[in-house]
Amino acid sequence: MGFEMSPMIGLASSGEGFSSLNLISLLGIGLLLLLTWCLGSARSKVNWRLVVTGLLLQIAIAALLFNSQSWTFPAARPEISSVAKLTELVEQVPEISGQVEQYIQKVAASDSMPARSWAEWRQSLEGSPEALADADRLIAAQPPVLPRFPRGILFYGVEQFFSLIRNCVEAGTSFVFRLNPGPEDKHDPLLLLKAFTFGVIPTVIFFGALMSVLYYLGVMRWVVQGMAWVMQRLLGTSGAESLAAAANVLIGQTEAPLVIKPFVGSMTRSELNCLMLGGFATISGSLMAVFASLGVSAGHLLTASIISAPAALVIAKILQPETERPLTLGSVEMPRNNEAVNVIDAAAQGASDGMRLAINVIAMLIAFLALIALVDAVLWGIGELVQGLVNSVSSSESRVDYHWTIKGIFSVLFAPLAWLMGIATSECYKSGEILGTKMVVNEFVAYLDLVDVMDQMKADGANAKVQLSERTQVILTYALCGFSNFASIGIQIGGIGALAPERRGDLAQLGLRAMIGGMIACCLTACVAGVLYGVL
């Protein structure tokens, strides 16, 4: 092999570009807005300026955050001086595999080697120490120019933040329980139980304490107040509903109403609907940390939560347009946290709140997973009965499988919705199953299903039973990012109703439609992600 070549080889971006799936996602935005309008209570009263402005705000924020993934700051990577180190990097950061492929092609062309793919090149080196040594010298002589931040500097920063949280949690749990969470085999029931008990739950507790401290120091107040100010000025929404929408991005459906507690009793029906729908369309910061620890992209989770705020306002104002004059039409400030005496007290209160949330998560998962098993058992029994009846009246054994499961039913019912968001037809049934699980069960179980598919693909590669493209994984990450499920209706009626008992009747009337609106808002953010994916 010759080595008379430039010392570095640059790599182009590996964006997928605009495709027909992006167009389907764009169509999905229009159809979801049309569906929402059809479900609305006062269609002639819809403020279309608010709708258009809110949609443009959502797209602008999403485009800014998506485009940040291109801020990768390419640089020479002289530390990648061998095939082994290049292979290790590709396994750690699969996103750069396309760029490594280009690097190999350029190396082959510049050294008069036959053009090979990355997999073929690695296979050709197996069992040949001399060829491997030559390849190592070749890579050392012309190190690849790879991005410092393959997912972009913003996503890198967010993921590093949640990684720091995970490391802090592991430090705490390792000290208290004398073990290190994160077992290699996630499918072993005992190891899975240990991973959940000593990994996920401590994350909720620690993040609760962290958020409480930030709230006490005024950081959260500043962030929420700023987001609310932007939405209020651009969309013309009232101060109370703008604050609630901004608070929902970070603190969740049960805590956000506390931010506007003095105003809940005097809110209009449109504002109440907006308050509830905002809770259904977002998740809390604690759960964001949990899902990131499970392997879901922290950058996409944060982006989804941010752009869901204007999406929730848009859908809420189509479903229940404002026909009254809100009390806080001008502006309203987020109240200060006067409950904690000092930072230590704030951390202690946050840890206690996190523990209550963790217990709620455990109870919720046990109850709903048990109910799913019960429903599946009933459906299986009905299927056995139908199968027997069909076979008894038929001359030949039926080839139709009547053994149904709740996930199988979801896959059929929600597959059209998955397609509408821009998911490839071949992946719509599995995506529909996950979407149905989110709405009927909860987002936690749905994310666990998505993570399980991702883990199987990582372990088995092309041999994995279920294959979901990166585009589909991104779209589902956005679609699942919300509390829009049937159980949350009761949670919100109980939580908000405790703040204003006289409005419990209104909350009960608005609950189901607000939850459906929250699901539509989540799907709307997924459509926006589908439009921008591969373009920015």
Predicted segments — roles?
Residues 1-20:
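Short, strongly hydrophobic alpha-helical membrane anchors
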Residues 17-29, 199, 405, 481-485:
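Structural signature of hydrophobic alpha-helical transmembrane segments
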Residues 28-40, 54-67, 204-213, 282-290, ...:
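Hydrophobic core segments of alpha-helical transmembrane domains in multi-pass membrane transport
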Residues 93, 355-460:
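Transmembrane helical segments that form the transport core of multi-pass membrane transport proteins
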Residues 159-233:
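Hydrophobic alpha-helical hairpins/lids featuring a short glycine-rich hinge
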Residues 224-259, 326-346, 388-395, 406-410, ...:
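Juxtamembrane inter-helical linkers in multi-pass membrane proteins
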Residues 234-291, 343, 432-516, 520-528:
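Alpha-helical membrane segments and immediately flanking helix-loop junctions
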Residues 306-359:
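Long, contiguous bundles of hydrophobic transmembrane helices that form the permeation core
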